[in-house]
């Protein structure tokens, strides 16, 4: 399996190779948000390209992480561990954090 760090570097290099944005983080976050919206619409409409739309979201997250120098794989692993230790309570039918 490919490591996320390698994917981050590959995504960033593809941006450089094609002359895509690598400096305007506001733009990158907006584009990632747009891709998430496209994924949501694909899911609502039960379109066959949902997986591709989710891949677009992941690609933007990988690119943003590389631009910012964040090891996304490490952050994900740490967050999964943190979430596994959280205590939740139900409030109005929704689970919310009670304790870290």
Stretches with model-predicted labels:
Residues 1-100:
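Flexible "arm" and connector segments at domain edges
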